[in-house]
Amino acid sequence: MKNGESMQDVKSANLELFYDCIDESNNILYEALHKNYFELIELTVNNILAADVICDVDDEVAEKLNKEYDKIANIDFTVEDVRKAMQAIILKGFKELRIPNGNTTPDTLGIFIAYLISKLVKEKSLSLMDPLCGTGNMLHTIINHLDKDCQAFACDNDLWMTKLTTMVSNLLGTPVEVYLQDCLTLNQKNLDCIVFDMPNTVKEDNKEYFPYKAILHFSEMLKENGSMIGIVNNDFFDYDKNQEFKKALLKDCSIIGLVELPDSLFVSKPKVILVIQKKIYEDKKNCFMVKLPSFTNVKEFNSSLMEIEAWFEKNKI
């Protein structure tokens, strides 16, 4: 580290270095192969993982690529450097391909969910699944901020989302078993924890509201005392006119927390975090209900955390 250079500066520089390497590799490959941006990311990641140019390009292009890869060959990147750089690259891909990405989960929420998991799961290891994983960024954020050994699973019904999740997982050296399928057809059992960011869903007449159907299905995948932490729209319960969803959920589960999130985090509807445990409490514990301030308001945010800490201490979850 140079004189006057902070650890934060080094981390930021490493993140930029990794991003620039991927980006320049994609540019070189585009000039040679004219593939779409996600395909370019896949080729670049495969080259980096192989520590060699394994895609079909001529020697001149291979030499240019190797010069880029040499820039990162001996750098000790943190998992967060790699994750953040890849998330920025993937977001650029969404923009290049003109794909809406309004449901991208802010990193701060992944970190906050990791905190909630640490309060709910005391064991040193756990099985963890995101059945609506998208690019996998929220899942990887959670894993990176959990001081636990994770057996991780992910699912999405979009081929490229599963590919991107797998690519990032491989770069991070974090094993994640990824499924390409409808989340309602998953048959995992005895999971310790399920996390998700529910996509914005319009309620269709005479059809069951997808988030209700999904959450009831996910609850069947949890082990006894397992937990589910999901981000949902704040009007989530408004569609449960006859309380049918709530009655079905509460047969085997308890809602133990509801966290209202800052509006500034989302470009569309405001959202909340729903915390569910697959356990029925005889004393019918009240759930914790917290309205989070902006994450940049450290004093008020810490006050909200103290409320949650006090609830867990009182209720011995």
Where do the protein language model's features map onto the residues?
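A short N-terminal interaction module
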Residues: 1-93
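Conserved SAM-binding motif I beta-strand of class I
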Residues: 151-156
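Conserved Class I SAM-dependent methyltransferase catalytic core
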Residues: 208-270
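Flexible, glycine-/basic-rich loop-and-beta segments that form/coincide
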Residues: 268-317
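Conserved SAM-binding loop of SAM-dependent methyltransferases across substrates and taxa
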Residues: 135-148
